[in-house]
Amino acid sequence: ATVASVGLAATFAGNGMNAVDVTWASMGQTLVMGFIFDRMSTLLAPAFVAIGLLVVIYSFPYMSDKNKEHPDAPRRRFYVYFSTFIGAMAGLAYSSTIVGQLVFFEITGVCSWGLISYYMTPTAKKAGMKALIITHIGALGLYIGAAFLFAGTGTFALSAISQLDSGMKTVVLLLILFVLSIHSLLMPGGEA
């Protein structure tokens, strides 16, 4: 995945391509889910994937049977959650619709829960549940933003935000910012 992402980024940087839109799901004329490959998405997604690769490499000693604190921990579950999390982060970068971002955001929330509560200790379970609740609260911002975007433009395409009147555009962008700020609570230094 890292090689493919970097190769895609190099293709866009080297060939001067503007953007490629791929429709994945639509209802009539309404784009529900799609992907955009442009300079920004092909910069962000490879960064997410490359950092994920480094984290996986760094995690090998912790996930081995030589881990004295947790020698019996099921390692496959960690790698499934982590790989899915990285894939969802790439999906967030490539998504061309707010519905797609919502789907990938929800996937990252479930994976965060699985990774945080990985060792299944009472403290880990409590922290994992808190993370799941926080990400679902954040997702409400995307649900509301999607509704406003669709009501104002008839589409879920992120590019349609520019078609909204200035007041509605501000509301939708603030809702997206709300989602990002809620998700940052799960990062080191956050309160979660």
What are these regions (language model features)?
Residues 12-15, 63-67, 113, 121-124, ...:
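Juxtamembrane/interface motifs at transmembrane-helix termini
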Residues 43, 110-111, 140:
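Catalytic P-loop NTPase motifs of RecA-like helicase/translocase cores
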